[in-house]
Amino acid sequence: MTLYSKIIGTGSYLPPNRVTNQDLIERLALDGIETSDEWIVSRSGISARHYADADMQSSDLAVEAAKRALDMAKLAANDIDLIILATSTPDFFGGFPSTACVVQRKLGVTNGCAAVDVQAVCSGFVYALATADKFIKSGSHKNVLVIGAEVFSRIIDFKDRTTCVLFGDGSGAVVMTASEEPGVLATKLHADGSYGDILCGPGRISNGVLEGSAFMYMDGQAVFKLAIGLLDKVANEVLQLAKMDASEVDWIVPHQANIRIMQGTAKKLGLSMDKMIVTVDQHGNTSAASIPMALDVGVRDGRIKPGQNVMMEGVGGGFTWGAVLARM
């Protein structure tokens, strides 16, 4: 019998603090930094994003999304035998205990299931999903909880208008299970460390002292130019692996980085933007959380239906990129 991994539940969570472009314009003005709604929207497509309260961590957001995904899957927390959590903003500096272990505790999972974090920034959820797929297909695990959760508002520099307007906080989750019916059809992951300096968190700790910046850095133009070509290439790679044509893809659920990157990707694939789930306008760029959040939106509003083919793809710091083609 051939084993497949199949998504049987999705969930997402946005912290309640919604921040509009006007809110940011007023905040930046206090430091003498000028921007406008037109400038932000024309370059990114973003009108609003959400920020977590100071006492909320990535694990808190992750737990809410996970509960919703488990509810849709009709599974209890103790039915999960592996948790994979993608984040670049873990609960603890240094990354341990892992945020996945914190989520395990907060969900009340007591079965001793494995729990691990994955760090590939905005590609993180794709990396986590592809990893879960391999564990399930090997027969070693049956029910896997895959989460992307971020509090990027903690690491953006509000004196840099080119980046601070882009990012937001949130979480998304899926439950995957072993199935005799095709679910995940193909996955492909890549990385190229030679581009590590165009999107990074350059600071490091030495002897308890921060060296360098505590904030993220992004060369937006370099990322934009690289991203469109890489996303087109990896999308075609998974289509080839699945022996499918782009016309057979019902929906693209991309990393919600920038509307221009998404438009460029759709154009290269010869697909209409009508086939793309877009949430960047209201969520901003939520890094590893963006794909599962957008997927959940598409599932819950009825656009993404059982049996349809969904392409999930993303690029992130490292430089990392990848794609997953799945039948819902």
UniProtKB/Swiss-Prot annotation:
Keywords: Acyltransferase, Cytoplasm, Fatty acid biosynthesis, Fatty acid metabolism, Lipid biosynthesis, Lipid metabolism, Multifunctional enzyme, Transferase
Cellular location(s): Cytoplasm
Region ranges (ACP-binding): 256-260
Protein name: Beta-ketoacyl-[acyl-carrier-protein] synthase III
Gene Ontology cellular component terms for the protein in this record: cytoplasm
Enzyme Commission designation: 2.3.1.180
Catalytic machinery residues: 122, 255, 285
GO biological process per UniProt: fatty acid biosynthetic process
Gene Ontology MF term list: 3-oxoacyl-[acyl-carrier-protein] synthase activity; beta-ketoacyl-acyl-carrier-protein synthase III activity
Family: Belongs to the thiolase-like superfamily. FabH family.
Gene3D superfamilies documented for this protein: 3.40.47.10
Domain statement: The last Arg residue of the ACP-binding site is essential for the weak association between ACP/AcpP and FabH.
Coiled coil: none
Subunit structure: Homodimer.
Pfam families: ACP_syn_III, ACP_syn_III_C
Pathway entry: Lipid metabolism; fatty acid biosynthesis
Source species of the chain: Herminiimonas arsenicoxydans
Keyword Cell membrane (UniProt): no
Keyword Lipid biosynthesis annotated: yes
Catalytic activity from the UniProt record: malonyl-[ACP] + acetyl-CoA + H(+) = 3-oxobutanoyl-[ACP] + CO2 + CoA
InterPro entries named in the record: ACP_syn_III_C (IPR013747), ACP_syn_III_N (IPR013751), FabH (IPR004655), Thiolase-like (IPR016039)
Role this protein plays: Catalyzes the condensation reaction of fatty acid synthesis by the addition to an acyl acceptor of two carbons from malonyl-ACP. Catalyzes the first condensation reaction which initiates fatty acid synthesis and may therefore play a role in governing the total rate of fatty acid production. Possesses both acetoacetyl-ACP synthase and acetyl transacylase activities. Its substrate specificity determines the biosynthesis of branched-chain and/or straight-chain of fatty acids.
